[in-house]
A protein has these predicted regions:
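Metal-dependent phosphoester/phosphodiester hydrolase catalytic core
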Residues: 39, 49-80, 84
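Short, solvent-exposed loop/turn and secondary-structure capping segments
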Residues: 24-26, 57, 68-69, 111-115, ...
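Second-shell loop/turn segments in exported
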Residues: 31-32, 66-75, 153-156, 199-200
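Extracytoplasmic/secreted proteins, especially bacterial periplasmic and envelope-associated proteins
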Residues: 9, 77, 81-84, 119, ...
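Structured beta-strand-rich core segments of catalytic domains in phosphoester-bond hydrolases
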Residues: 2-53, 57-61
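Metal-dependent phosphoester-hydrolase catalytic domains
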Residues: 35-37, 88-100, 106-217
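Extracytoplasmic/secreted cell-surface and envelope-processing proteins
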Residues: 7-10, 65-68, 108-112
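Active-site flanking residues adjacent to catalytic metal/cofactor-binding acidic residues
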Residues: 59, 103-104
Length: 217
């Protein structure tokens, strides 16, 4: 579990597999006139699955509270931290480890930088931008190879539209067996709209739908 100091909200990993090498990576930005808002650190942990190792990066990026455009700079910084850490793994010789990046990115998948993969027949890739020109290509289960969505239902319903701000991104030898939002009651209503928790009625769960993704490594 990782959370900012003096905060009751953080990120956590529950696992049936052995975990090791937990590290956290925090922002410390002092180049803007605006003071850096409180943010959750990036979690990095290794999962041991049989004879294989999988690196997991858990994210919860800055919300759009305060304005989407006004807060985008902080999500850009968090994107940079993630891209740099993945890039560092390749430099350190861990390029064979499959990598899963997941969490609430507060940025819908189509709003990331998208481009065709560097190899033929790879389809659309989500590109994470680091510093000094570092670019990390990843695969999103939200997207088909032609860039269209794999599901009609997103993870967050806002202003009458589905958003896909909760994400999985994959690198390495990973096959997606199944993926989608979990819409069973009491998580969602009959239209699959998430039922956020109501403190007055003590009902509902979350304004985000959980994602279920089965992968083969």
């Amino acid at each position: 579990c990782a959370l900012p100091i003096y905060s009751a909200i953080g990120c956590a990993v529950f696992s049936r597999f052995e975990l090791s090498n937990l590290t956290v990576h925090s922002l410390d930005v002092r180049v803007h006139k605006e003071k850096q808002p409180s943010s959750r650190p990036l979690m990095q942990v290794t999962a041991h699955i049989g004879q294989k190792e999988l690196t997991l990066f858990v994210n919860h990026w800055k919300s759009k509270s305060g304005g989407e455009e006004e807060t985008e700079i902080w999500r850009d910084w968090q994107e940079s931290v993630l891209a740099q850490r993945v890039h560092s793994m390749y430099i350190e010789g861990f390029e064979e480890n499959p990598i899963v990046m997941c969490g609430d990115f507060n940025r819908s998948v189509e709003d990331f930088t998208l481009q065709n993969g560097s190899k033929a027949k790879e389809g659309i890739k989500v590109v994470l931008r680091g510093t000094d020109g570092v670019l990390v290509e990843s695969v999103s289960p939200w997207l088909k190879k032609n860039g269209s969505f794999t599901t009609e239902i997103g993870s967050y319903f806002f202003d009458g539209n589905w958003e896909r701000i909760d994400n999985f991104f994959f690198l390495g030898d990973i096959v997606v067996n199944s993926f989608g939002s979990v819409t069973e009651p009491p998580l969602a209503d009959e239209k699959s709209i998430p039922q956020g928790y109501n403190i007055y009625t003590d009902s509902g769960c979350s304004d985000h739908l959980p994602l279920k993704c089965e992968i083969i490594i």
